[in-house]
């Protein structure tokens, strides 16, 4: 694990070490708006109940395994090294009178990695370790750094997971980015590559969101001959509007396109103009902020 080079980095590269086994990996994230510290619960293999065609995690196997004490050590090592570098640079600035060196603040600690985090038996322990690291190094929940979970939303059907998430939302201000790729069973099946039931997934998302706030994230890209269009986006907007009308707390919607390679090379990103067109349909139908992310970053509406 290494610190990202200051002034370098790309949203198209979210590497997790040479063999994909790093537990802690700094990346530049479009949706975080800067430096995000990723946490990977699957250093040995990809583990997910979806097979999203756009997924950038290539199949692999490695010798590593997840251990909670190792995650704690890796987070502490990363933040200690970062603090040492920052102190050295501040000393240099004091000696030279310079103050123009770039320094990227940590926008979030994000639990994501090589699969679906809620499937891991270490999920709860990992969240607790991340929250502790944020308190130790970044000022806790009031320090300006989010604690984020990226999930495919299937865990919302499990009472143990929802109870844990609700507790983390209340105690640690956990921000949940919940995937909802589609507005009908066919669209959902194409984007998830799974047989998981669409209606049940939507119902479990809504059930949780009626109790705790979430962010909805939706991938928009070409998959073979399939491409989202304004008609489909109208159904998507109607779906979200219905959830909101029944009391779901959706903080905002993230519409984003593909930015990194996928193993099957079946997917292609949508251009900025097309993304804005589709986002306009959603914005007109829901009463929450809609943020739009192209290949290179956020697109102002």
Roles of regions detected by a PLM:
Residues 1-32, 225-301:
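Auxiliary Fe-S-binding modules of radical SAM enzymes
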Residues 21-58, 98-101, 107-111:
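N-terminal pre-triad scaffold of radical SAM enzymes
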Residues 40-42, 58-60, 112-114, 152, ...:
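Short strand-loop junctions, especially beta-strand C-caps/beta-turns
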Residues 54-171:
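Conserved Radical SAM active-site core
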Residues 67, 197, 274:
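Short acidic-hydrophobic sequence patches enriched in Asp/Glu that either
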Residues 119-268:
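Conserved AdoMet/S-adenosylmethionine-binding subsite of the radical SAM
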């Amino acid at each position: 694990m290494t610190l990202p080079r200051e002034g370098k980095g790309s949203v198209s590269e979210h590497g997790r070490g040479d063999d994909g086994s790093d537990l802690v990996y700094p990346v530049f994230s479009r949706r975080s708006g800067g430096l995000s510290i990723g946490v990977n619960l699957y250093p040995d293999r990809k583990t997910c109940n979806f097979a999203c065609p756009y997924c950038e995690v290539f199949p692999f196997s490695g010798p590593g395994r997840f251990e909670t004490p190792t995650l704690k050590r890796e987070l502490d090592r990363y933040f200690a090294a970062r603090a040492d570098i920052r102190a050295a640079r501040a000393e240099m600035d004091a000696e030279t009178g310079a103050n123009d060196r770039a320094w990227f603040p940590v926008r979030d600690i994000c639990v994501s990695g090589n699969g679906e985090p809620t499937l891991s038996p270490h999920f709860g322990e990992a969240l607790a370790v991340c929250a502790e690291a944020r308190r130790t190094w970044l000022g806790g929940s009031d320090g300006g750094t989010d604690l984020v979970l990226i999930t495919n939303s299937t865990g919302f059907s499990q009472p143990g997971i929802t109870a844990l998430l609700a507790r983390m939302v209340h105690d640690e201000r956990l921000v949940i980015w919940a995937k909802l790729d589609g507005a009908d069973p066919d669209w959902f099946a194409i984007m998830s590559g799974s047989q998981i039931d669409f209606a049940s997934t939507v119902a479990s998302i809504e059930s949780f969101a009626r109790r705790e706030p979430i962010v909805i994230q939706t991938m928009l890209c070409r998959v073979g001959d399939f491409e989202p269009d304004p008609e489909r986006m109208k159904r998507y907007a109607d779906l979200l509007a219905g959830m909101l009308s029944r009391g779901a707390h959706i903080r905002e919607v993230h519409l984003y396109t593909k930015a990194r390679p996928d193993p099957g090379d079946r997917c292609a990103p949508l251009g900025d103009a097309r993304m804005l067109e589709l986002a306009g349909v959603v914005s007109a139908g829901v009463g929450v902020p809609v943020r739009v992310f192209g290949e290179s970053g956020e697109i102002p509406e």
